């Protein structure tokens, strides 16, 4: 069903480093990521679950699965978007996340909305 244009969701991610919530001396690097999920298909659909693969700079990978996002299972009409912000802690200055959302259209069709890999990185300051 992934190639059917009736069932298409676009995901945009904007990550940022949270210096004020990080303690590098203790190996704690906090990142926030803002997500925009838009129903680009022709059928209303609900986001049911999330699946993340989080990889730190040492190659350690963690799988995170759960219902909905930020306590919600948003229902999106065609063209409608849902925004949320969440966060993650890493033990390294950089890493990446990728994953997908499980979606169910109003007609009962199940499909996934892929989340392309994005980089989490502490910005460098030039002196």
UniProtKB/Swiss-Prot annotation:
Q: Per the UniProt entry, what is one GO biological process?
A: error-free translesion synthesis
Top-rank taxon of the source lineage equals Bacteria
| InterPro entries reported for this sequence | ApaG_domain (IPR007474), ApaG_sf (IPR036767), Uncharacterised_ApaG (IPR023065)
Q: Where is the ApaG domain?
A: 3-127
Q: Which HAMAP family match?
A: ApaG (MF_00791)
- Protein known as: Protein ApaG
Source organism per entry reads Xanthomonas euvesicatoria pv. vesicatoria (strain 85-10) (Xanthomonas campestris pv. vesicatoria)
């Amino acid at each position: 069903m992934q190639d059917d244009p009736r069932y298409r969701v676009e995901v945009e991610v904007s990550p940022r480093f949270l210096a004020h919530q990080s303690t590098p001396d203790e190996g704690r690097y906090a990142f926030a990521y803002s997500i925009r999920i838009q129903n680009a298909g022709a059928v209303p659909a609900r986001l049911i679950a999330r699946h993340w693969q989080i990889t730190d700079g040492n190659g350690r990978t963690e799988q995170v699965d759960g219902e909905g996002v930020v306590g919600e299972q948003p229902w999106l009409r065609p063209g409608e978007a849902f925004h949320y912000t969440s966060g993650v802690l890493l033990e390294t200055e950089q890493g990446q996340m990728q994953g997908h959302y499980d979606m169910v259209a109003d007609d009962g069709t199940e499909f996934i909305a892929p989340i392309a890999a994005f980089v989490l990185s502490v910005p460098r300051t030039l002196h």
